[in-house]
Amino acid sequence: MKPLNIIFAGTPDFAAQHLQALLQSQHNVLAVYTQPDKPAGRGQTLRASAVKILAEKHHIPVYQPKSLRKVEVQENLSKLNADVMVVVAYGLILPLAVLQTFPLGCLNVHGSLLPRWRGAAPIQRAIWAGDKKTGVTIMQMNEGLDTGDMLHKVCCDITPTETSTSLYTKLANIAPKALLEVLDGLEQSLFKAEVQDESLSNYAEKLSKEEAKLDWSLSAEQLERCIRAFNPWPMSYFVTQDSQGTLQTLKVYQASVLPHQDKPCGTILAADKRGIQVATANGVLNLEQLQPAGKKPMSARDLLNSRADWFKIGQVL
């Protein structure tokens, strides 16, 4: 088993953790591709990606093309003479010319048990849908969206209190090891490629702020999953009205499900030390930790101590 010469393509912290694992392995990272620096923060100063920061720390050449479709970009990639390209949350489409550049192909690390969730938000959609388990798939890339042949899968449970933040951490802990196992056996074809079953695929649509608004016509169970799935972004929220008639927006960090009461959806049933209880299509959603605009997250009890007028019994949200 000889060391492989690798081009790594990735952008966020999740990708950087895989790059770190490669740097600590027997394999050679020849170069890194990552998205261009982007404005961030109040000052909108350009900020480098987590992958770029790590690569520069280890004196690895960094390339940041806006697209991989240009011929000169593809020629530069080919001149690096790598055995394989490893892609983790890169954010750019790989055209066929790039996919055909490397003798051992392009490997992708995807945060779901394919073909269950293809697309941009597999971690969040697994929680949103109520899946009991998820995992990571290492696949050989093709021109489709997460449709390539699967080489290796590793699983993990989704707990009843799992948020996207905690699940992201779980997957980041198990995925790099799975990637290295595949790379170590790639030349010997130790992992048999498995074609995905199209009938089992779902599209993990990108999250939006609009979707994050709590829809009381859904069930309490669905809403509780949304709250966990949309944490840390875009954060589930709802709007209420104070005694002056001013609209107040609150993000929800934690909630639980209580037995159903036959009241119109969105009706505030109770507001006490246990939480703020709201009727839904099926079951009651008990809001336990919330964040008013401009404030830190707080318990329902603490919020009610100062803002009880925001939550009148019988009020419909």
Swiss-Prot record:
The keyword ATP-binding does not apply. InterPro entries: Fmt, Formyl_trans_C, Formyl_trans_C_sf, Formyl_transf_N, Formyl_transf_N_sf, Formyl_transferase-like_C_sf, GART_AS, Met-tRNA-FMT_C. Its EC number is 2.1.2.9. GO terms for molecular function: methionyl-tRNA formyltransferase activity. It holds the Pfam family Formyl_trans_N. (6S)-5,6,7,8-tetrahydrofolate binds at S112, L113, L114, P115. It catalyses: L-methionyl-tRNA(fMet) + (6R)-10-formyltetrahydrofolate = N-formyl-L-methionyl-tRNA(fMet) + (6S)-5,6,7,8-tetrahydrofolate + H(+). Signal peptide: none annotated. Keywords: Protein biosynthesis, Transferase. One of its GO terms (cellular component) is cytosol. The keyword Protein biosynthesis applies. Coiled coil: none annotated. Attaches a formyl group to the free amino group of methionyl-tRNA(fMet). The formyl group appears to play a dual role in the initiator identity of N-formylmethionyl-tRNA by promoting its recognition by IF2 and preventing the misappropriation of this tRNA by the elongation apparatus. Belongs to the Fmt family. This is Methionyl-tRNA formyltransferase. The gene is fmt.
